[in-house]
């Protein structure tokens, strides 16, 4: 069973426990286990079979037993027990942006509303006002959340879809006769959300591959099955499509089914001008002679272009850049040396000790990590005195670690509604990495949000603007913002913008990355880790940066520590963005 499916079940158990039993300890335990498993790079099923689940943080014997049931039978008795206590539509209400378990419990138990449709009717009729602490403003907010929820229906976050795809590919590669198996579609282009999963396999005999695909453990229903292709719906709710190709056509099919449609049209138009024809079967001349198709490189070479990375294939200038020899050398995860936004247990929502974070970073090959716990505006955040003590603790541990890795003393400081920072500037001035971010009043108009950020960036003590648009994929839209104005001030003040690699954020967006590059503003790619296991999430931020045409020279945390420290000093990032 795929890691993502196990994590989904554990998360659902946590939601149901909160609604039915209210045991906060058990709820937290299941939520943490779900998060750890969702982000674990290895196979959870394999760990179970090897008796090694206990090696994962937060996975005790009780939860390990539930995971074992899932791996062995595909079912979980605890989930079935709890699901019987709650109408199916109640769980869907929990997926609405800004509608938490306490609100859902009140809506369900006080008003007898059992699904999203009933909730919408109650908001429109005013009946929702009968529930405690739910007024007219809240009703309008819930209606907006319902509208956004429906607009996003049927799409899955990149990291979850990738987890399902990789698990399926691992099984398909074990089928005798399979020469190659790859993901295609928007998932290969690393779009932040995907509507389905496209898999391509190169094999001379398609039959065994199709049969293996339709019999995978995560399949809920077979939607279509033919000699060389099949479609299934996974238990996770997303559709997966398989096509089996002869090896000589695999590259052509991989290019075609990777897309985007706009990119494919642009490339076909170029081919026509050259007297060629491109299809999913290959590149052909006017006489029907096949010029290539076994690899994507052959496809591009036949039309006089170098290989274009999948992340760029959106018809946003990549073909013109390739023709002119100006394709960027996109940043890679191996280029990154550090992580400049990491939380420890010193503030409210961090779950790992400093030593755990250092060990995890060392294992991942990181050279430096900035510890940036929350300031006092967040629950249990640090005031100036506690921040100074925490910084001293970080520096003492850094001295003992002797550069394996280096720990930098920092903070994630709130930008208050006025634009002032949550801590005095003198408390921030001695820190090596100050990440400033908005966490409140997200519904303010663009002009107010922009001026709020501009004032914060102009303070002289901020190094990085964290998760610059505040979005959370699938649950919260970005707040309104005049990005051009923010970039102008960031360049002037020497502030970098963050590409937050948290899979639920991915903020800046790819479009924002291109805008930052054009404005001469560097970015940092950071995990915003709240647990040591999150440190492996950098790849998601790297993919956003690649979609945004960024190179290593555009990303500050590709720098050796000595140069990074120099660039983080006042004004250095803006000068350096063009100088590397």
Q: What residue ranges belong to the model's regions?
A:
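Charged, compositionally biased N-terminal leader segments and the immediate start
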Residues: 1-22
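Accessory alpha-helical DNA-binding modules that contact the DNA backbone or grooves
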Residues: 14, 24-230, 242, 251-252, ...
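Short amphipathic alpha-helical interaction patches enriched in hydrophobic/aromatic residues
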Residues: 14-21, 150-154, 438, 442, ...
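Two-metal-ion RNase H-like nuclease active-site motif
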Residues: 181-183, 338-342, 412
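Hydrophobic pocket-lining residues within nucleotide cofactor-binding pockets
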Residues: 187, 413-415
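Charged catalytic cores and adjacent phosphate/nucleic-acid-binding surfaces used
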Residues: 190-344, 350-365, 376-406, 417-580
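Core AdoMet radical
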Residues: 370, 411-412
